[in-house]
Amino acid sequence: MPQLDKFTYFTQFFWSCLFLFTFYIAICNDGDGLLGISRILKLRNQLLSHRTNNIRSKDPNSLEDILRKGFSTGLSYMYSSLFEDSQWCKAVDLLGKRRKITLISCFGEISGSRGMERNIFYLISKSSYSTSSNPGWGITCRNDIMLIHVPHGQGSIGF
């Protein structure tokens, strides 16, 4: 970079400041510019804070109901998706047996039973609720609650 004298430096500084401040004012004074975005974000945060204050409940039974509904929805989704996958695998296996090739013998199965679900719900209901500075959603998870699905019975895949 060339060495500039003070006068040349000043003119470049002046024109760059004038150019940047002109665009800054044009952007910020526009209703859709930066100030408009900040107003929208402030309004959104206010609406979300009002909504979360109405939703929060200090009743541990309602939190337990939410957990139960969430787990039952997740389990039913898991059962239905694995059932559909198993049906697909059986259809592909039947098609392969007609052609005397084994494509997929089995996708996997759920080795747990409904008793396992009851045991999980029992452990969740026994879990302790925290009473810290965050009232409402302060639930501490127990370390001994863990649900792992490991598909087994995976057959050979041949192409």
From Swiss-Prot:
Membrane-spanning intervals of the chain: 10-28
EC nos: 7.1.2.2
GO cellular component: mitochondrial membrane; proton-transporting ATP synthase complex
Catalyzed chemical reaction(s): ATP + H2O + 4 H(+)(in) = ADP + phosphate + 5 H(+)(out)
Bilayer topology annotation: Single-pass membrane protein
Subcellular location: Mitochondrion membrane
Top-rank EC class of the record's enzyme: translocase
Keyword Nucleotide-binding found: yes
Disulfide-bond pairs as recorded: none
Record keywords: ATP synthesis, ATP-binding, CF(0), Hydrogen ion transport, Ion transport, Membrane, Mitochondrion, Nucleotide-binding, Translocase, Transmembrane, Transmembrane helix, Transport
One Pfam short name: YMF19_C
Listed GO biological process terms: ATP biosynthetic process; proton transmembrane transport
Quaternary state and interactors: F-type ATPases have 2 components, CF(1) - the catalytic core - and CF(0) - the membrane proton channel. CF(1) has five subunits: alpha(3), beta(3), gamma(1), delta(1), epsilon(1). CF(0) has three main subunits: a, b and c.
Function summary: This is one of the chains of the nonenzymatic component (CF(0) subunit) of the mitochondrial ATPase complex.
Protein name according to UniProt: Putative ATP synthase protein YMF19
Organism annotation: Helianthus annuus
The gene coding this protein: YMF19
